[in-house]
Amino acid sequence: MKLLTDWLVLDGCSLAVDDLVAVARGGVPVRLSPASLELVRRSRAFVEALLEGDEIVYGITTGFGYFKNRRIPRSAVEQLQQNLLMSSAAGLGEPFGREVVRAMLLLRANTLAQGYSGVRPETLQLLVAMLNRGVHPVVPCRGSVGASGDLAPLAHLALVLTGEGEAEVGGEVLPGAAALARAGLEPIRLGAKEGLALINGTQAMSALGALTVHRAQRLAKLADLACAMTLEATLGSRSAFLPHFHRLRPHPGQQSSARNLLVLTEDSALIASHAGCDRVQDAYSLRCAPQVHGASLDAISYAAGVIAIEINSVTDNPLIFADTGQVVTGGHFHGQPVAMASDVLAIALAELADISERRTERLVNADYSNGLPMFLTEAGGLHSGYMVAQYTAASLVSENKVLAHPACVDSIPTSAGQEDHVSMGLTAARKAVTVCDNCERVIAIELMCAAQALDLRGKLTPGRGSRVGLEVIRAAVPHLESDRIVSRDIEKVVELMADGHLLEAVEAACGRLD
């Protein structure tokens, strides 16, 4: 995807996760490249030519799944496609949020733009117009087994193109036809192959995966910031992060985390104040942070690599090779790559939360904190300080341990045994979102407690990264003098993390973290 003034040009093969976020969250409008539209025209012309002959082609002149051998007469091929959307719209549960639906629209347009799916240009153009004009289909979050792709969610998405289903426009949920009309658009009547082309793919799980990877990459850096602040507040040592030490075990993520921790704690008067103390080494949750954070960062990088490929892949079936005159039936719709990556992502985030909660315990427990008051309150007894904040972190970490169980190892056959291995990719992606939400809050609790602890250390200043982190948090959350409703403070820190403000301020002072 290329930036053209204030637009992003969609060509089917160069979409980045940052581009997706800009469209899904930031509302950046999209155009189709002329080259992509030409490829789509050629692909469609080939499908039209097939219809003039007597060839049997799956999904064009046959039924679907178990009904693969049922021949469909030429007069019914268009009704076949609409029937497919209606029967596949079997999703249940809460609808996906707006940014997820926008990401789904974008990804479906991107895969169709490569010109291997046989849709008409006007069908693809309507998909893009819906995205640009804010027509967001109501898509239930449950119902996909991850092969053939995300059929149920994408069917709910695609129904709106035909005037069916429901969509949100300007905050109001309307019937599909009314939603299109509100945006100045008209529904289409599906042509041969188009229903299948619109719903056969991994765009629901991939949309969630891309958005979660983007958050996870930021959380990995914020986990390093939280650790740095806790290290300084508990009078820990930087020696376990030295470059020559980490060169002996050169995992990329470990190297990055160690460098970040050194940068964030640079020029720390707190660390310098106890340079000659008799403590030999810190607890694992501090000393081994690069090894644990780094392993999670490497896992996040793996997931990001899978997602980067998937969002620029063609995941339809069958695929139309107009240049060679072939229609190839295969399995690009199978979500196993995204399912496995999502499970790995959830495990990585669960571990970031796990070790963060242990550091929070070291902050609030006077037996571990090297001189800080119990629960970080100077009036313990009358006030309980951050006692129960650690309970909340423990609860979220426990929930993550359940959710970290992989979904991709499960498979339940469907379509009367024809589709006898499925990925459960959307289940994996949805779990990863919840784990990410929990992880964000666990790290927010550590940051909140670390800020309080740094205040309690008095006039000794922390390192340059920790110092900025403290300043940003204090601008939103005041020092805890007496008990107040803690959940509000946690959510304020979460907001600083989620909107990028905290990380941006720290990186402005320290340079870009790894």
UniProtKB/Swiss-Prot annotation:
Query: Which terms does the UniProt entry file under GO BP?
Result: L-histidine catabolic process; L-histidine catabolic process to glutamate and formamide; L-histidine catabolic process to glutamate and formate
What EC number(s) is this enzyme filed under? Answer: 4.3.1.3
Q: Which domain of life is it from?
A: Bacteria
Q: Which Gene3D superfamilies match?
A: Fumarase/aspartase (Central domain), Fumarase/aspartase (N-terminal domain)
SUPFAM superfamilies to which the protein is assigned, alphabetical: L-aspartase-like
Compartment(s): Cytoplasm
GO CC, sorted alphabetically, is: cytoplasm
Principal subcellular localization: cytoplasm
Q: In which pathway does it act?
A: Amino-acid degradation; L-histidine degradation into L-glutamate; N-formimidoyl-L-glutamate from L-histidine: step 1/3
Q: Which residues carry this modification: 2,3-didehydroalanine (Ser)?
A: 148
How is the protein modified post-translationally, according to the record?
Answer: Contains an active site 4-methylidene-imidazol-5-one (MIO), which is formed autocatalytically by cyclization and dehydration of residues Ala-Ser-Gly.
Catalytically driven reaction(s): L-histidine = trans-urocanate + NH4(+)
Cross-link 5-imidazolinone (Ala-Gly): where in chain: 147-149
Q: List the disulfide bonds.
A: none
**Record key words, sorted:** Cytoplasm, Histidine metabolism, Lyase
InterPro entries of this UniProt entry?
A: Aromatic_Lyase (IPR001106), Fumarase/histidase_N (IPR024083), HutH (IPR005921), L-Aspartase-like (IPR008948), Phe/His_NH3-lyase_AS (IPR022313)
GO MF, any single term: histidine ammonia-lyase activity
The record's annotation in HAMAP family points to: His_ammonia_lyase
Q: Which family does it belong to?
A: Belongs to the PAL/histidase family.
| Alphabetized NCBIfam families for the sequence | hutH, PRK09367.1
Name of the molecule in the record: Histidine ammonia-lyase
Taxonomic source organism: Gloeobacter violaceus (strain ATCC 29082 / PCC 7421)
